Amino acid sequence: MEPRWVVVAAVALVVLALALVLALRRRSRPPRAVVAAAPPPTATDRLRRGLVATRERLLGQLDAVLARGPDDADRVYPELEEALVAADVGVRTAGELVARVRGRVGRGGDAGGIRAAVRDEVAAILGADSPPAPTARPWVVLVLGVNGVGKTTTIGKLAALHAAAGRRVLMVAGDTFRAAAIDQLGIWAERTGAELVRQGPGANPAAVAFDGMKAAIARGVDVVLVDTAGRLHTRANLMEELRKMQRVVAREVAGASHETLLVLDATTGQNAIAQARTFTDAIGVTGIVLTKLDGTARGGVVIAIRKETGLPIRYVGVGEAVDDLRPFDAGQFTAALFDGDRGGAKGSVFS
């Protein structure tokens, strides 16, 4: 029988051999590639992504028009106008825009010059307005819109924006005709850390607004977002209810409402302009929130709304995520609409 030390030595040699083999295997493996994390999308990236359908329609037709040869000089501007109308810029706005482009470029311009002129004119129409920073406390925002435009969701996302800026937010569930709207605001209140004033379904909306203003003052909140019932813009009696809420808010908080935002669905195209005019005549809208821009090729309606109503675009929605509702920036919007394309038509358009 072999001595014990021989067995121990053999086991030790086996262990050392295994360790050596494993070490050699590790050395022979290629180093793992380190993949850098992609940077988060910028606001312009999100807009560009949301406007892809509009951009493809508008720039696709624009490029086709600008690719015309010298013999087609007289057709370029009428077809340019048709391309803008197809993107829901609107007949009147498209006509005025093309007239200004023609006045700037004339018959001697090339494709690049016309494209740049269209871009500049769109930027000029959209202007440089941005949502005003709250200057009063509480800063009261009344939110209006017909059913189905995403009004209550917009209020939740506005609460998230203000909360991210360090503001204390109170939401008022003034849409008492829909129990689901009250419950939905409750979910958004929990999600954003906002406070909520609510009553049961069927309660008087003006009474809920009254409670909301009293609570806002007592609690010292910074921003109050007041939901209202969705209604057809052609129903006079329902519009009178909105005016009553507005009077209650103004009586309880000096200077309120400080903003009256109308939420419009971009997919409705030119009908959104009719809604904006009617609500403005009845209530006095101060700004537009345009939702669902990511779901339509009719995003040119942004230009038409701004031009034909004179109302500033305050926010745009380009997706379902909370941060896909962004303060409107005319420069970012124009860049997303015109600069995210395939490079555009090249060469001379006119002789």
Which stretches of residues belong to each language-model region?
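Primarily NTPase-proximal linker/entry elements flanking Walker-type ATP/GTP-binding cores
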Residues: 41-226
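Conserved catalytic-core segment of NTP-binding enzymes
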Residues: 184, 204-219, 233-344
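Short juxtamembrane segments adjacent to a transmembrane helix
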Residues: 27-49
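Feature marks short, highly hydrophobic, charge-poor N-terminal signal-anchor/signal peptide-like helices
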Residues: 1-13
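Structural recognition of the conserved hydrophobic beta-strand(s) that form the central parallel beta-sheet
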Residues: 225-227, 263-264
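Short glycine-rich anion-binding loops that position phosphate/pyrophosphate groups of nucleotides
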Residues: 229-231
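Cytosolic-side junction of a single-pass transmembrane alpha-helix
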Residues: 16-31
